[in-house]
Amino acid sequence: MTAHWISVRQLRQFGMLGMNCRNVDFINRYNRRSLYPLVDDKLKTKLLAQEYGVPMPGLQFVVREQHEISHIERQLVNSDSFVLKPSKGSGGKGILVVIGREGDDYIKSSGARIGVADIRRHMSNILAGLYSLGGASDVVIIEDLIA
């Protein structure tokens, strides 16, 4: 199989922006820097969007501290599918998509099976800042999976 590459010129003709162009010519130009904290935090963004009636996946619950992780089985008891993610993650890192459940196993979008201990570990890593910019502590967002 051979790869077919499109030139930068062709991408521009199709209206594609490079990251630098996007950031400098659009994001920086049309957005006040003082508002960045509202959109750099997925939980704040979600709550703000809901306040203005923007449709969003339902928020199941939020985990803010390590000790809360021990209670997740009760919170997930009726959840066969959900998305678990860091509030301040970047580039899609740290997102766990659960598409189903069989017995005590949760089924990831990849088809892999994980247990509640794996989910707890993932949450702990998020809280510790493993996926956030600069390694700052974070919160875990658990929301509805939309198909």
Please provide the spans of the model-predicted regions.
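Conserved oxyanion/phosphate-binding beta-strand-loop segments in alpha/beta enzyme cores
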Residues: M1-G18
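Residue-level signal for the start and early helices of compact helical domains
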Residues: W5-V8, Y30, L47-G53, Y131-L133, ...
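A conserved helix-loop-beta module that forms one wall/lid of the active-site cleft
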Residues: C21-L96, D105-I126
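Phosphate-binding site of ATP-dependent enzymes
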Residues: G111-A147
